[in-house]
Each structure stands twice: as C-alpha cells, then as structure tokens.
Amino acid sequence: MSDSLRIIFAGTPDFAARHLDALLTSGHNIVGVFTQPDRPAGRGKKLMPSPVKVLAEEKGLPVFQPVSLRPQENQHLVADLHADVMVVVAYGLILPKAVLDMPRLGCINVHGSLLPRWRGAAPIQRSLWAGDAETGVTIMQMDVGLDTGDMLYKLACPITAEDTSGSLYNKLAELGPQGLITTLKQLADGTATPEAQNEALVTHAEKLSKEEARIDWSLSAAQLERCIRAFNPWPMSWLEIDGQPVKVWQASVIEDATQSLPGTILAATKQGIQVATGKGILNLLSLQPAGKKAMSAQDLLNSRREWFIPGNRLA
C-alpha cells in the first residue's frame, strides 16, 4: 500500500492483541512491538508472556519488554526504529515526552470510552456503573497528561441492560481496530482533524477495588444491579455470609417500596433471594459461594437455606 506507515505497537493484554492482529492485515509495516515484561501467573507462578508478546512472536515481529521507558537507553530502542507513528493500546507504562515526540506523527492511543467522559484506568466498568446509555472508543493523539490529548476519531456503541464489563469489553475490542485503521489512513493521507477535549465534560474512571465491590445495601437496587454488571468479570460484587465471601453474578431490580432496613431478606424462593436496599428490592439470581461454581438462587437455597431466612439481615 502506497500510504503504508512504519508503526511501533505498544500494548499488553488481549484487548491490545486484537488491535495488533488488525494492524497485521492492514498493509502497514509493524517495525517493533513493546509490551510489559513477562509476569508470574497461575498457581505455579510461572512467568507468562503477555497476549501481545505471544502474537508478535508468532508473527516474527521484534519484541521489546522494558520495565520503564524513562531510562535513556530504553528510549533509544524507540528512536532506533524510525517509526512514523506509535500505536498504544492498554500498554501499562507511562510514555515520557521524549518518547511521545519521537515518531514523525507522534503517538496515538485507543481509549475505551467516548472522551472526555471517563478518562483513566477503568472506563468500561465506570460507564456501566454510572448507568450510561452508550460508550465507545476514542482514538486520540497522546500528550503528557492522562487521556487528555486531542481526539482524532470516535465510534459509539449502545450499552444494553444485559451488558457486563466482559461483554462491553468484547464489543469495544471489535470497534477499536475499526477506528484505529480509519485513523491511520487519515494520518497517512493528511486528512486527520484533531479536536480538543472539552474540559467542562471531563469525568474520571477511578480504578476498581475488591472493597468497592462489596455490596452496600444502603445504595439503591438499580445502582447495585449496575455494580454487579460493571464488576463482572473483575473484581465481582460480593457479600459476606457466615464469614465467607459469596460472589453475586446476576440480579434484577424490583421497584416495590419497602419499609425494611437495607440488607433485610424479604423472601427466598426459586424466583430469587429478595433483599431490601436503600431504594427498591434487589433480587439475587445467581451466586457463587467460596470454592464453588456459580449457581442459581434455587440451587444455593437447596444447600444453604439457613443463610437466607426472611427477616434476617445481610451485612
């Protein structure tokens, strides 16, 4: 292709690998791949390569795994590749200004939200958590700030009432490569039109924690149901019963008003375990006790009915 670009790709997880895969068939020249160092994983804590490294090595691409890009010798790794552009997708390392300025067309990033909404670490989860009607991907020109650069291209997708972070992740992993390939074409032929982010519309997608995922019964049933979908597959919403954590995979909202204190078990039937919240009733449908597989409320009641006596309160 005549407008082929020399591209450095920087990314680490599966989400990034899907973008690298799309680039490999786009006609551009991938001159190097940067990814995080191998990390211990699994029960044996064996060093495991990132999904991006696995794909890059499979395709015979040069792979670089610096712990940081701050040292000058590591910055030379980037400079020596003489790239037109660096594509960054969920890389996990900060790019110093010296690196951002090295490629002729700078560095571009695929971000999992419609910027300036949800800058930061957990945009997919926060869009669900907040009850947003849509999300998408933004391809942006990187600068030294956190997701503050000019926007080059956006693609939106609706958020459904069934979406979890897992399903939304897959949708955006399809959209991202489309937006990336389009943006690279525009950069190559000089038609890209950068648009500054409106600072008045900025929201921040804070990292998730296991403690935040603990169910707080004082919240509304609607908010809790969104949390359950937002925190799936990680860190998973959970509650504590008899000193052990029980994950909640699925729930529904019953809008009925209740005078019972938040956390009070109102009913436990094959239709679900109904619990009073700060507003409305949360109907627990699928749960997972520690060391067990996820199961329906009915199956859990068959073995642990004493956990869910109506009138008792969950912590």
Curated annotation (Swiss-Prot):
User: What's a Gene Ontology MF term here?
Assistant: methionyl-tRNA formyltransferase activity
Top-rank EC class of the record's enzyme: transferase
Which UniProt keyword terms apply here? Protein biosynthesis, Transferase
Q: Which GO terms describe its cellular component?
A: cytosol
Where are the coiled-coil regions?
none
InterPro entries reported in the protein's UniProt record: Fmt, Formyl_trans_C, Formyl_trans_C_sf, Formyl_transf_N, Formyl_transf_N_sf, Formyl_transferase-like_C_sf, GART_AS, Met-tRNA-FMT_C
- Return the EC number: 2.1.2.9
Q: What is this protein called?
A: Methionyl-tRNA formyltransferase
Gene this protein is translated from: fmt
